[in-house]
């Protein structure tokens, strides 16, 4: 049975198109870890109120949005040209929020020192930050996800499964199996947060958890 499941999973693997985001949602990682190939969309125009520059965590008061302010000259600015507004001390605020949310989680101390340097340096471009985040999370999970980048933008694609919609949390209806969260005794299980929530609570068991899901 296990061999059949493994074979069936390989046969169903997809070539996917997806956005690089800031500490991606769990659904993002379900899509990527289950993919045959991953291509990141980098030729799009920037859109506000998406996960390109935000993540959601589980704070003592429930769900919390962590947003990075960005600078853009027009509504048609390419995302790869979007600069971070470093006048706002987002690094300090985000790190303190992560500490308040996860310092009592099982794996916070194990991973936080590897993540800390990210919040101690200033990045110029949002896209560069997102790719550094991607590599950091992969290292923490103990996985490697090879990827390519787009060279031009297409509104519709026929040769890949288009998961770009996942960048918009309002359009992402993914439901995942509950796992233990720090404050679930107060607020219950909160679905599909940042991959950091799964990492701090499940450690490298998170990889097995992700592989139990598919989109």
PLM feature segments, named:
Residues 2-215:
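Residues lining hydrophobic/aromatic ligand-binding pockets adjacent to catalytic sites
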């Amino acid at each position: 049975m296990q061999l059949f499941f493994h074979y069936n999973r390989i046969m169903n693997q997809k070539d996917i198109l997806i956005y690089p985001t800031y500490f991606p949602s769990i659904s993002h990682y379900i899509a990527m870890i289950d993919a045959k190939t991953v291509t990141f969309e980098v030729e799009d125009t920037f859109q506000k109120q998406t996960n390109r520059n935000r993540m959601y965590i589980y704070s003592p008061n429930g769900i919390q949005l962590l947003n990075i302010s960005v600078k853009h000259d027009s509504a048609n600015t390419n995302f790869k040209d979007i600069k971070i507004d470093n006048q706002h001390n987002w690094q300090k605020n985000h790190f303190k929020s992560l500490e308040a949310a996860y310092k009592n989680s099982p794996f916070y101390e194990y991973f936080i020192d590897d993540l800390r340097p990210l919040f101690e340096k200033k990045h110029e471009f949002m896209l560069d930050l997102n790719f550094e985040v991607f590599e950091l999370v992969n290292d923490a999970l103990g996985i490697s996800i090879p990827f390519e980048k787009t060279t031009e933008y297409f509104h519709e694609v026929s040769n890949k499964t288009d998961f770009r919609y996942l960048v918009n949390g309002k359009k992402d209806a993914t439901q995942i199996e509950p796992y233990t969260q720090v404050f679930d005794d107060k607020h219950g299980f909160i679905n599909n947060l940042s991959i950091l929530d799964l990492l701090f609570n499940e450690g490298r068991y998170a990889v097995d958890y992700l592989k139990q899901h598919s989109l």
